[in-house]
């Protein structure tokens, strides 16, 4: 296909309407107006207060002008499962994609309002292609500006507003390949004089538990004194590296560049009786069970950080 033929096919869309008029699912109504003004923080009383509206010469409350487009939106279900419309925007979009204009950004939206909308008005909209520009060089890439005119009518067919809508359909610029960035580091633990011994032992792949030298009570997380007898004297014992899942959560959000989402944060009850917050690896999240036996493994997060993690005592499928 020559460039001239493609240009003719594009320009043939100028002046055409994009599909049939689309009627709003619901008439203008006060509940939706209330939702809108509360979300926007718009306290103008003429939108919800009949008395205030009549005091300004209006017959009743009115809808904010900014809601015009909202009254004809097709809704969630139709957006998730749209039905193709002959001669609609989908066909024009496909033709633009054929020319490599696969990316889009909205550039302008100009409204002209003919009258205010009141509860009971039922709005429809039809869109017409006004112009398709020659190819332009932009900061985003080479593209074309598509200008359409949307005409909004009430249930009597009278024009209540028009909207001139402009999009830039463009070919994304090819970016030069850059050197791969090193993987982000895991967040650094807050190490202090009370817990430094624990992280030093972890560097040596030893999982230790703090023990009161006076009453022999094990404790975790580490602390300066025994919560049972108050002694400041302590030593450590090395954990066997076995335990069970006491509780867990699956983290999906917020994403962090150091972690592969989703990941499992588990509270593991060690055989010795103390509990440790850690990661559970080697198992799909939906296969985890409370009470599941787990064994110690080690994660070399980076050269400066080695952490204990746990995996199922009986190997599991990770998929």
From Swiss-Prot:
GO BP annotations listed: bile acid catabolic process; lipid catabolic process
Subunit field text: Heterodimer composed of ChsH1 and ChsH2. Two heterodimers combine to form a heterotetramer. The complex interacts with Ltp2 via the DUF35 C-terminal region of ChsH2.
Any GO molecular function: lyase activity
EC number per UniProt: 4.2.1.-
Family from the record: Belongs to the thioester dehydratase family.
Keyword Transmembrane (UniProt): no
Family matches, as InterPro entries: ChsH2_C (IPR002878), ChsH2_Znr (IPR022002), FAS1-like_DH_region (IPR039569), HotDog_dom_sf (IPR029069), NA-bd_OB-fold (IPR012340), Thioester_dehydratase-like (IPR052513)
Function: Probably involved in bile acid degradation.
Protein name (Swiss-Prot/TrEMBL): Probable enoyl-CoA hydratase alpha subunit
Domain of life: Bacteria
Gene: chsH2
Protein keywords: Bile acid catabolism, Lipid degradation, Lipid metabolism, Lyase, Steroid metabolism
Alphabetical list of Gene3D superfamilies matching this protein: Hotdog Thioesterase
Species of provenance: Thermomonospora curvata (strain ATCC 19995 / DSM 43183 / JCM 3096 / KCTC 9072 / NBRC 15933 / NCIMB 10081 / Henssen B9)
Residue segments, region DUF35: 199-298
Any Pfam family matching the protein: FAS1_DH_region
């Amino acid at each position: 296909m020559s460039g001239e033929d493609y240009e003719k096919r594009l320009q043939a869309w100028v002046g055409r309407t994009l599909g049939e008029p689309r009627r709003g699912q619901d008439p203008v109504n006060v509940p939706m107006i209330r939702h809108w003004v509360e979300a926007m923080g718009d306290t103008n009383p003429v939108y919800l207060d009949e008395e205030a509206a009549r005091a300004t010469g209006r017959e009743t409350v009115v809808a904010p002008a900014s809601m015009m487009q909202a009254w004809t939106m097709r809704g969630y279900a139709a957006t998730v499962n749209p039905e193709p419309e002959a001669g609609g925007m989908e066909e024009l979009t496909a033709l633009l994609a054929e020319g490599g204009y696969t990316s889009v950004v909205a550039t302008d939206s100009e409204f002209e309002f003919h009258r205010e909308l009141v509860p009971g008005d039922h709005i429809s909209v039809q869109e017409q292609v006004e112009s398709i520009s020659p190819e332009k060089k932009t900061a985003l890439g080479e593209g074309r500006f598509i200008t359409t005119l949307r005409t909004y009518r009430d249930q009597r067919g009278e024009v209540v507003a028009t909207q001139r809508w402009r999009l830039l359909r463009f070919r994304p610029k090819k970016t030069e390949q850059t050197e791969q960035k090193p993987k982000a580091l895991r967040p650094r633990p807050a190490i202090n004089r009370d817990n430094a011994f624990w992280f030093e032992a972890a560097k040596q792949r030893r999982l230790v538990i703090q023990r009161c030298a006076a009453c022999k009570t094990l404790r975790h997380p580490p602390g300066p004194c025994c919560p049972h007898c108050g002694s400041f004297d302590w030593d450590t014992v090395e954990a066997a590296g076995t335990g069970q899942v006491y509780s867990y959560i699956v983290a999906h959000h917020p994403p962090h560049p150091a972690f592969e989402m989703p990941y499992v944060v588990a509270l593991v009850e060690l055989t010795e009786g103390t509990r440790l917050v850690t990661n559970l690896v080697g198992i799909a999240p939906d296969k985890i069970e409370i009470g599941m036996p787990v064994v110690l493994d080690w994660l070399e997060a980076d050269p400066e950080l080695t952490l204990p993690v746990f995996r199922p005592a009986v190997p599991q499928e990770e998929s």
